[in-house]
Curated annotation (Swiss-Prot):
Family membership: Belongs to the methyltransferase superfamily. UbiG/COQ3 family.
Major enzyme class: transferase
Name the record gives this protein: Ubiquinone biosynthesis O-methyltransferase
Pathway assigned to this chain's UniProt record: Cofactor biosynthesis; ubiquinone biosynthesis
Keyword Transferase (UniProt): yes
Gene Ontology BP, a term: methylation
GO molecular function term, any single one: 2-polyprenyl-6-hydroxyphenol methylase activity
Keywords for the protein's UniProt record, in alphabetical order: Methyltransferase, S-adenosyl-L-methionine, Transferase, Ubiquinone biosynthesis
Record-linked Gene3D superfamilies: Vaccinia Virus protein VP39 (3.40.50.150)
Reaction(s) catalysed by this chain's protein: a 3-demethylubiquinol + S-adenosyl-L-methionine = a ubiquinol + S-adenosyl-L-homocysteine + H(+); a 3-(all-trans-polyprenyl)benzene-1,2-diol + S-adenosyl-L-methionine = a 2-methoxy-6-(all-trans-polyprenyl)phenol + S-adenosyl-L-homocysteine + H(+)
Binding of S-adenosyl-L-methionine, residues: R43, G77, D98, M144
Record lineage: Bacteria, Pseudomonadati, Pseudomonadota, Gammaproteobacteria, Moraxellales
Intrachain disulfide bonds: none
Annotated EC: 2.1.1.222, 2.1.1.64
Length: 257
């Protein structure tokens, strides 16, 4: 896709370039994306729990009890494929999409090295464009740590709704916007603890749960669950809890009718 086309889509070119420059770091578990590797088991398990709890289908071969196994999954803003690969390993048929060409090269190479080519593929396409041609084609859609990096997150949420089959589950994650999240996600994570590169986040783009709820409701999703993601810098331990002051995930469902 030409750069001028990307510029016309819902994307901040500077954000794409920022992550493209870090493409070589995606699978370095102690590098720039170490935090994503550390939180991935938590978010993966929570995604699967919500699929088991909320997924509904008339297809007897795709039951909720099976979790991700056998489901057709779309990972929006997949980056280097950390979450995409982990879902494929749990038996899902996964498509990852991103606008960072270097990210996708890193993701595709690692998928090939991991022998996951049969159940995992990547595409360089905006989610809105995919929604125009593949509406209702996915059982599960994930969009993690991406909404706070785009100009119009509501359009992303709406596209996720369109891509889901009725009864499907969508899981979204982002960062709350308040003084505590600024202190933890920017001052703490980027400047004090150096968990993330400086400039990774823009506080103005953070999204409150109420704002994300409204985006989901406007897209006609039904809320299923919400959870906060927490970190203790002393013990270097991550965990999930009800407090959503900083990082959080929500699970929503596309109604059957």
């Amino acid at each position: 896709m030409a750069d001028d086309t990307i510029n016309a889509i819902n994307v901040d070119p500077s954000e794409v370039e920022k992550f493209n420059k870090l493409a070589g770091e995606w699978w370095n578990k102690t590098g720039a994306f170490a935090t994503l590797h550390e939180i991935n088991p938590l978010r993966l398990n929570w995604i699967e729990e919500n699929v088991k709890r909320g997924y509904v289908s008339a297809d007897s071969q795709k039951t909720a009890e099976m979790g991700l196994a056998g489901k057709k999954v779309l990972d929006v803003g997949c980056g280097g494929g950390i979450l995409s690969e982990s879902m494929a390993r749990r038996g899902a048929d996964v498509t990852g999409i991103d606008l960072g060409t270097e990210n996708l090269k890193a993701a595709s190479l690692h998928a090939e090295q991991s022998n996951l080519q049969d159940t995992l593929r990547y595409q360089h396409i905006p989610v809105e464009a995919l929604a125009a041609t593949h509406a209702g084609q996915f059982d599960v859609v994930t969009c993690m740590e991406m909404l706070e990096h785009v100009p119009d997150p509501a359009a992303i949420v709406d596209a996720c709704f369109k891509l889901l089959a009725p009864g499907g589950v969508c899981v979204l994650s982002t960062i709350n916007r308040n003084p505590k999240s600024y202190l933890f996600a920017i001052v703490g994570a980027e400047y004090v603890l150096r968990l993330l590169d400086r400039g990774t986040h823009d506080y103005a783009k953070f999204i409150t749960p109420a704002e994300l709820d409204k985006m989901a409701i406007d897209a006609e999703f039904a809320r299923q669950d919400i959870i906060g993601l927490h970190y203790n810098p002393l013990t270097k331990r991550y965990w999930l809890a009800q407090n959503v002051d900083v990082n959080y995930m929500i699970a929503v469902q596309k109604p059957l009718a």
